[in-house]
Amino acid sequence: MFRNVAELVQLAETNQVKIAEIMIRQEIEVSGLTREEIIAKMDKNLTVMEQAVERGLRGVHSHTGLTGGDAVLIQNYIKSGKALGGEVLLDAVSKAVATNEVNAAMGVICATPTAGSAGVVPGTLFAVKEKLQPTREEMIEFLFTAAAFGFVVANNASISGAAGGCQAEVGSASGMAAAAIVELAGGTAQQAAEAMAITLKNMLGLVCDPVAGLVEVPCVKRNAMGASNAITAADMALAGVTSRIPCDEVIHAMFLIGQSMPSSLRETAEGGLAATPTGRRLEQEIFGNGNTVKLKNLIIT
C-alpha cells in the first residue's frame, strides 16, 4: 500500500507497471473485491461521466437560474473557428462546465473527488480522448490514475472545501486530471507526479466562497480553469519540466494553507465573492427571508 506520491511512483517504477495498475492492486487488497468487480465499478463511473457531459452539452440550467448554458456557448465558439486557445483546451473547458452545470441542475454526476469539482477529470478525459483515441480500457485506467493521486491528497491533506478551501476541491481535481493525462499520453510515473505538483502549486490559496452557499457561482467556472490548468501542466511535464518542490511537499503545503484559512473562506458563504454586494443580492433573491428558497417558479418552504 502506498501512503504518498513518492511511494506510489516507486511502486510503479519497481513493478514496471502504470500507476493505474498500482491503484487497482491496492483496491483489490483493501476492498476484497475481484479485479473484474473493481474495474466494473469504475466503468460504471465512466458511464455516469459520459452521460453528464452529453446532457450538459445539450444545455441545462439550474433551478436558481445562477448557472447554465455556458457549455453550449463555449462549444459554439469552438465551432466558429475564432477561438484563440487550442481546441483540446477549450473542449476540456466546455465539458468541465457541462458536468458542473448538470450538477447544479440536480443531475447525476460522479464526484471526482467532490461534486463541486466533478467537472475537471471528465472534462479533460473526454477532451484528450478526441486527440489520443484511447480504448475504453485506457479511459478506465485514466480514472484509476486520477484516483491514486486523489487518494494521496485525501489521506495527507483534504479534498473538502469546508476544510481546505477550493484549492482542496478544484485544486485536487486539477492535479488528479493532470497526472492521469500524462499517463494516458505515455508519460512516466514521475512525470505524472510532476504534473500533479505543477498543477497544485498554481491552485494554492484558492478559497471556497460559493454565492448563497450553492455550488454554482463561482464553482462552475472554477472547474473550467481547473481543466485548463491540468492540460497545461500535463503538457509541461511531458515536455520535461519539473517542479522544484516535490509533489508530496506541495500537497502538505496545501494542507497547511487550508488550516490557516479563516472559516469565512471555507464554504461558509461568509466571505470572498459570496460577500460582495452582488453576491448578497443574489442570495437575497434566492432565499428571501431565509426560510423560503425561490427556485424560478418553484418554491420550497
Task: Pin down the residues of each PLM region.
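Glycine/charged-rich beta-loop-alpha catalytic/anionic-binding loops adjacent to active sites
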Residues: N100-C110, V153-A163, P210-V215
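Helix-rich "cap/lid" substructures immediately adjacent to catalytic or cofactor-binding pockets
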Residues: L89-A104, A127-N156
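Alpha-helical support elements that line or immediately flank enzyme active sites
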Residues: P122-Q133, I181-G186
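Amphipathic, non-membrane alpha-helical segments in soluble helical-bundle scaffolds
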Residues: R35, I39, K82, G86-L89, ...
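Generic N-terminal targeting/processing segments that precede catalytic cores or assembly contacts
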Residues: M1-G107, K131, G240, C247-T301
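A structural signal for small-residue-enriched, beta-sheet-centric alpha/beta enzyme cores
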Residues: G161-S174, A178-L184, A189-T301
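Glycine/serine-rich anion-binding loops at beta->alpha junctions
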Residues: E101-F126, Q167-S174
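Hydrophobic alpha-helical segments and helix-packing faces
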Residues: S117, T135, M139-F142, A146, ...
